[in-house]
Amino acid sequence: IALSTPNGVGNWFHKTWVGAEEGINDWNFIKLHWNLHPERNEDWRKEQDKLLGPSLAAQECDCDFITSGQTVIDGVILDEYREKQCQDPLEKRGVDSNLWIWQPPNYTKDYVLSADVSRGDGSDYSAFHVMDIETMEQVAEYKGRMSTKDFGNLCVNVATEYNNALLVVENNNIGWAALQQCIDRGYENLFYTSKDLKYVDTEHQINNRYRTQDRNMVAGFSMTMKTRPLVISKLEEYFREKSVIVRSNRLIDELFVFIYNNNKA
């Protein structure tokens, strides 16, 4: 027996519930809505909104996965993205078939490849996304497990294929192992950040390329206590304003479980 209120989507309880509804696992599902209780009515439900807030009230009262959970990006928005924008890739490449392609390179366009590096020991995934800079459309994605060295090489190979895309690799901890591969292979359009994190000159970066000998620059992007809230705020803004085009169901699944915990994402 597994007893719970909904708490977002993409987690074990949600996947097990959906599987039971579709009849693809051995679980039976029973939904007990709040209005089955003889002493509860619409006035009680409205009072729960006031006491708990709309999101937590949806979680505790409505048996609604989409509007439950403290997701950074509103679940309704993510569901809309899945319905209207997500597509099967045109091609799946690589030994693990985890490099998904929605659009081949257009050599009149500029692209950015943003990469997040995992340890490569099976406990987490490394991932990157390739975006068309002008249209903000996702054109390729990788999510899988491989060594940091192999992942660094894959980043360089795909960035080179996509018109020498601006290659942005997070440089925290294990990210340096993948970054070193990019540096050793002499990839020219590698993203550099100022060491004091006071600025990121995007126009200069894209058009002129930073020189690796600039002493005030460090390879990659540093996700710190200073930059993380800014990145998360901009991510939420892009989705809320529909400024970005997302093709990947895998990415939407990840965002459904990207939640606030003690006011931190």
Q: Model-derived features: where do they sit?
A:
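Short, well-ordered loop/turn elements at secondary-structure boundaries
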Residues: 25-26, 107-109, 123-125, 161-164, ...
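Beta-sheet entry/capping signal
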Residues: 1, 27-29, 111-112, 127, ...
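Hydrophobic residues at beta-strand termini and immediately following loops
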Residues: 3, 30-32, 61, 139-142
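ASCE P-loop NTPase helicase motor core
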Residues: 1-52, 178-184
